[in-house]
Amino acid sequence: MDICGVDSEGKEFNSVQEMWREEIGEGDETKKTQWYRDGVSYWEGVEASVDGVLGGYGHVNDADIIGSEVFLKTLLQERLVNNVGANQHLVALDCGSGIGRITKNLLIRYFNEVDLLEPVAQFLDAARENLASAGSETHKATNFFCVPLQEFTPAAGRYDVIWVQWCIGHLTDNDFVSFFNRAKGYLKPGGFFVVKENLAKNGFVLDKEDHSITRSDPYFKQLFRQCGLHLYRTKDQKGLPQELFAVKMYALTVDTPPKIHRTRSKTRSNRPQIIK
């Protein structure tokens, strides 16, 4: 993959392969394990609050949820209601769920069940507490998995939607591809992925502090192709502070969509600022 990038300390890399060799070695499972351990350790030192998980930008929560809801409503209508019917029992997986922010403010209102996946125990404990009185008998958080994304293997065919937001940057490229290849089997027929992530203006930006990588749009699309996923629809998130990375939403399907919907992305300067 011929993609150049930089890290948060200003070091330049001529290729993504060069960066990964430095960070996780080649076939060095010990070094790769440490990469993941360091990433979790960073978040273990963060307060289990909206402001904490959003990197001090708690005020972006409303804009984020509004943008996600507009995107999700269209997808549910096109992909599920029109094809299966309005009365089916819908189940979602919230990947990198943190304290349950997205589940509480969005997913639990549209899905009958939501499972939460989060490797940081204190965040998941906070999610249980935050969601204890949220929803209803027919719209509720069901399972709380304290498992890293790269190790998660749920029941086959359980989910209508797998929501991946501000967490996939912690996975290496190989584990990114492995996760989505496994996750295809987690989806029900007609189900889809939503990936919502920060975008680097060019190439990639490696954050040395939290051990994550912010990928560019072409970088993401290369990885999606490697996963055998089809780009169904995209949308740029609006209303975020200028100093943050641009944020883009991708809807991805296993089946080939009849038409690909694209929107023109606005680019902003790279900033080593990761929000979760």
From Swiss-Prot:
GO terms classed as biological process: methylation
EC number, UniProt record: 2.1.1.244
Top-rank EC class of the record's enzyme: transferase
Pfam family, one: Methyltransf_PK
S-adenosyl-L-methionine listed as a keyword: yes
Catalytic reaction annotation: N-terminal L-alanyl-L-prolyl-L-lysyl-[protein] + 3 S-adenosyl-L-methionine = N-terminal N,N,N-trimethyl-L-alanyl-L-prolyl-L-lysyl-[protein] + 3 S-adenosyl-L-homocysteine + 3 H(+); N-terminal L-seryl-L-prolyl-L-lysyl-[protein] + 3 S-adenosyl-L-methionine = N-terminal N,N,N-trimethyl-L-seryl-L-prolyl-L-lysyl-[protein] + 3 S-adenosyl-L-homocysteine + 3 H(+); N-terminal L-prolyl-L-prolyl-L-lysyl-[protein] + 2 S-adenosyl-L-methionine = N-terminal N,N-dimethyl-L-prolyl-L-prolyl-L-lysyl-[protein] + 2 S-adenosyl-L-homocysteine + 2 H(+)
Gene Ontology molecular functions: N-terminal protein N-methyltransferase activity
Keyword vocabulary terms for this entry: Methyltransferase, S-adenosyl-L-methionine, Transferase
Domain of life of the organism encoding this protein: Eukaryota
Binding positions (S-adenosyl-L-methionine): G96, R101, E118, P119, V120, L149, Q150, Q165
Family label: Belongs to the methyltransferase superfamily. NTM1 family.
Function, as annotated: Alpha-N-methyltransferase that methylates the N-terminus of target proteins containing the N-terminal motif [Ala/Pro/Ser]-Pro-Lys when the initiator Met is cleaved. Specifically catalyzes mono-, di- or tri-methylation of exposed alpha-amino group of Ala or Ser residue in the [Ala/Ser]-Pro-Lys motif and mono- or di-methylation of Pro in the Pro-Pro-Lys motif.
Identification of the protein by name: Alpha N-terminal protein methyltransferase 1
Originating organism: Arabidopsis thaliana
